[in-house]
From Swiss-Prot:
Pfam families attached to this UniProt entry: Peptidase_M43
Compositional bias ranges of the Polar residues kind: 615-659, 670-686
This protein's GO CC annotations: virion component
Gene3D superfamilies referenced in this protein's UniProt entry, alphabetically: Collagenase (Catalytic Domain)
Taxonomy, superkingdom: Viruses
Coiled coil segments of this chain: 496-524
Span list, region Disordered: 595-736, 844-872
A single GO molecular function term of this UniProt record: metallopeptidase activity
Name of the protein: Uncharacterized protein R722
Family annotation (InterPro entries): MetalloPept_cat_dom_sf, Peptidase_M43
Biased composition (Low complexity): 687-736
Record's keyword terms, sorted: Coiled coil, Virion
Length: 872
């Protein structure tokens, strides 16, 4: 643990030397970009030498602060970002033809300070060979502070488990994952330069950066350590002038580290005991004559250590070279043309997180969606004039406030349309290049000639090299040979992407060759009208896509394996097996698989047999051939053909079992005779005869439907044709069923009763039965005792029926319990009083017998208490 400037910095190991950049010659990522850089320079060397150096390129910087909330001050962060912007502008633009001013003068002072009395070394570094590579004018690349964004980070990034040299790629991936987890992704990396300030511990690397030709992702930009952003907190003196940001900005704009013949031995790898140790040889402090003895003694060793792209500490670097400035401007124009905010308007979103209040604020209105800073010039450390001062920042348009103050005034401006414009000026530029000189005149020939001059050339006229495929294949074999770089570095991201592109290009080339061979074997139609007599036209077949062939083969295989028997609605193949035993096919199918032909009798169960089907030999009509029934002619009800599956094994499938007939359980009910005596069924009889009663004209159609229902096939396939079914004790005959139906029909029509759909059939039947018995008791009492008053006899008869016999309900079998969990039995007592009929002794066999002596044992109300028995 160490304490610097009242800030505790935890550390697990000693870091001897800090390094500006994580890239070095042993990094796979850097070597891949090194090859890409050399390829770009080789292909565009002429364009780089002729690049325009006078146009101003204005670049906006976005700072993403990923620091713990209590470890920094917001005002200090704003001040430090302005210092970094000033340092970048000075390093890129403070150059002059006068060698005694600006960075030119700074270079001389550094050489004199390092070598002192060593005039030989001073003469080498101050010679014309070194002086001519220093720029004599500004690069005209200006930097501007766009916006600062804060993120609620709770912890620092610990990189103690990685080595700073051998695990540099793993460190980079860990940092990118930390940025993504903090939801601090890059904002429009093609229009802005995103810079992340991260609090890293246990690492000596000060930053990473992306090259302009790399794939743009959420971490595309510059990643800087807090050590180079707040160097005073760490007591850092070697990297306190913010030249680390200049170094990484050069990487981000396409520059590499400075290499010359003196740096060819800058990498040394010593292998011992199966482990590899990497030692990097670079100059950090040129005044250190012990570690840099060769620099002060050897006349042939003269590295260019004052360049910003070297690893030298901040106080000994001073300039770029002319070639480096040309490369940076070319990379911006080629890979990031939208980075210039002067040509492409770009607005930065306002920050939402406030680190002082630890809150996230949303957008207030449309005017505050983007940041609009004051248009003041960027300050500089130098007093000399600089072209960057001409770059102005965006300001709020005053017309917006005028429109808000006066909403009736529209924001429309009259557009000036020139009149009598020459028609040749309206011809669009379709070729995308400099337009040729157009001829004046409005004649038809001149207009057509001007239009033809601006038409783009056809791409079919461009000649392709004949041996392009051979060169590509030769290059591919060289790159992917056993001694190539990609074999030794398989995890190179750039080469891995290039490998996939090469493979896809080769596959496309092979496919095109196959299509050409196919077209060569097919007669191509000749020019002219193919319908003319005597003209032969060959049949042209276009090339077939391999994906279409695969889809066609898949459809053909599915069609061959498709079995239509599997998709029948009631086919047993859907639930038994793909094949059916032929022995089972000879028998009729299970009747449960058929759709019922007529509605079953409501007094019977689901699988109960209607006795009317056995009358007059109706079951023999379709017993021998059930398929003869016209109702089963549909394909869904047809029997499977046994010859369709000749290879099936009969032992594989069990025999179909025959289910015995099930009878209505209500027939065993002692109250079933009373319930059905009046012709009412507890199921759907009321609803069945309700429709009949509403339309009495349906009586004739009902009789015809009853006659047709007697002709339906039997539901028991194993029953013999001439054999009558066994008569069960509770099973009714056909005459009884018809008689019950007729009685119920007559009873409903005589009473003028319509069943309510909300009343259950069981309750309606019980109520009607009680009413019938009450009427019968009243009639019998009037005949037996004519002297008694009518009111007394009616009350007696009604009370006898109401209180003497318990009511019949559908839930007799369900036990009932009181609130104490005790079972409740049917009792003749009502509210603690014995029924009048029970007390008088007029209880018949139809009613429940009650002993009058038990009246004293009647249960009292639960609100009354009885005294406990006293001991004798």
């Amino acid at each position: 643990m160490s304490k610097q400037n009242n800030r505790i910095i935890p550390t697990n190991r000693d870091k001897k030397i800090c390094r500006k950049c994580g890239y070095h010659v042993c990094s796979d990522h850097y070597v891949a970009n090194l090859n890409k850089h050399h390829e770009i320079i080789k292909n565009h060397n002429d364009k780089i030498n002729r690049v325009n150096m006078n146009d101003i390129i204005n670049i906006k910087l976005l700072f993403h602060i990923l620091l713990p909330r209590d470890s920094f001050n917001k005002d200090k962060v704003i001040s430090r970002t302005h210092d970094i912007v000033c340092s970048l502008n000075d390093d890129f633009n403070n150059y002059s033809s006068n060698t005694n001013t600006m960075n030119n003068s700074k270079y001389k002072n550094i050489i004199k300070q390092i070598f002192g009395a060593n005039t030989i070394k001073q003469g080498i570094y101050l010679s014309s060979d070194y002086q001519k590579i220093i720029p004599e004018k500004s690069s005209n690349i200006v930097f501007e502070l766009g916006e600062i964004y804060y993120y609620p980070v709770k912890h620092k990034l610990n990189l103690s488990k990685y080595d700073d040299i051998s695990d540099v790629e793993s460190q980079r991936h860990e940092i990118e994952q930390y940025v993504r987890s903090s939801e601090a992704g890059a904002y429009e990396p093609k229009k802005f330069v995103n810079i992340w300030i991260i609090d890293m511990i246990d690492t000596s690397i000060l930053g990473f950066s992306n090259f302009p030709w790399e794939v743009v992702n959420s971490c595309h930009g510059i990643i800087a350590n807090r050590r180079c952003f707040f160097p005073e907190e760490y007591g850092e003196s070697n990297y306190s002038s913010f030249k680390t940001f200049t170094h990484h900005m050069g990487h981000h704009l396409g520059l590499l580290h400075v290499y010359n013949p003196n740096h060819c031995q800058s990498k040394s790898c010593d292998s011992s005991g199966g482990s590899k140790s990497i030692v990097l040889d670079f100059i950090i402090d040129p005044l250190d004559k012990i570690n840099n003895k060769k620099l002060h003694i050897d006349k042939e060793y003269n590295p260019y250590f004052t360049n910003f792209m070297d690893f030298t500490c901040d106080k000994y670097v001073s300039n770029f070279t002319v070639r480096q400035i040309q490369e940076m401007r070319f990379m911006i124009n080629k890979f990031k043309p939208k980075l210039n905010s002067l040509l492409n308007e770009s607005q930065c979103p306002i920050p939402k997180y406030n680190p002082e209040t630890d809150t996230i604020s949303a957008t207030i209105n449309f005017n505050q969606r983007f940041s609009n800073r004051e248009g003041s010039a960027v300050p500089s450390y130098e007093k000399a004039d600089n072209p960057r001062m001409s770059a102005s920042q965006g300001m709020i348009n005053p017309e917006i406030f005028m429109g808000i103050a006066d909403p009736q005034q529209p924001f429309l401006k009259p557009t000036v349309v020139p009149t009598n414009k020459n028609i040749n000026d309206l011809i669009p530029n379709l070729c995308g290049t400099t337009l040729p000189t157009r001829k004046s005149g409005n004649t038809q020939d001149q207009i057509i000639e001007n239009i033809q001059n601006v038409l783009p050339s056809s791409y079919m006229n461009s000649e392709q090299p004949k041996d392009a495929y051979a060169d590509f294949k030769k290059k591919y074999n060289i790159i992917y040979s056993e001694d190539s770089y990609i074999i030794n570095h398989p995890h190179n991201p750039y080469l891995l992407q290039q490998h996939h592109q090469d493979i896809s290009a080769m596959q496309q080339q092979i496919l095109e060759e196959k299509n050409q061979l196919r077209r060569a074997t097919i007669d191509v139609p000749v020019c002219g009208n193919p319908y003319n007599a005597g003209q032969t036209v060959g049949h042209y077949v276009p090339p077939i896509n391999p994906e279409e062939i695969d889809r066609f083969n898949a459809k053909r295989q599915f069609a061959e394996s498709f079995n239509p028997e599997m998709f029948r609605p009631n086919d047993p193949l859907m639930y038994q097996s793909p094949q059916v035993d032929p022995s089972c096919c000879q028998k009729p199918m299970d009747p449960r698989l058929y759709r019922p032909a007529v509605p079953s009798d409501p007094r019977m169960g689901q699988y109960m047999t209607d006795p009317r089907l056995f009358q007059n030999g109706n079951q023999t009509q379709y017993q021998s051939n059930p398929q003869s029934n016209p109702q089963f002619n549909h394909q869904a009800y047809s029997q499977p053909n046994p010859q369709a599956y000749p290879q099936s094994n009969p032992q594989m499938y069990p025999q179909q079992t025959t289910f015995p007939p099930r009878y209505d359980p209500r027939m065993n009910n002692p109250y079933a005779s009373r319930a059905t005596s009046n012709g009412l069924s507890p199921n759907n009889v009321v609803q069945q005869y309700q429709s009949y009663y509403d339309n009495p004209s349906n009586q004739q159609s009902n009789q015809q439907s009853n006659q047709q229902s007697n002709q339906q096939p039997n539901q028991q396939p194993n029953q013999q044709p001439n054999q009558q079914p066994n008569q069960q004790p509770n099973q009714q005959s056909v005459q009884q069923c018809n008689q019950v139906n007729q009685e119920a029909l007559n009873d409903l029509r005589s009473r003028n009763i319509k069943a309510s759909p909300t009343v259950s059939p069981g309750d309606l039947i019980n109520k009607m039965n009680r009413v019938n018995e009450q009427l019968q008791n009243i009639k019998s009492s009037l005949q037996q005792d004519p002297d008694t008053s009518t009111t007394t006899r009616v009350n007696t008869a009604v009370g006898q029926r109401s209180f003497g016999v318990p009511r019949v309900s559908n839930d007799q079998s369900k036990p009932k319990f009181n609130k104490f969990g005790q079972p409740i039995t049917n009792s003749p007592f009502v509210s603690g009083n014995v029924a009048s009929t029970a007390m008088s002794g007029k209880i018949t066999k139809e009613n429940i017998s009650v002993n009058p002596r038990d009246a004293s044992k009647a249960p009292k109300s639960r609100f009354q208490r009885t005294k406990p028995p006293q001991a004798v």
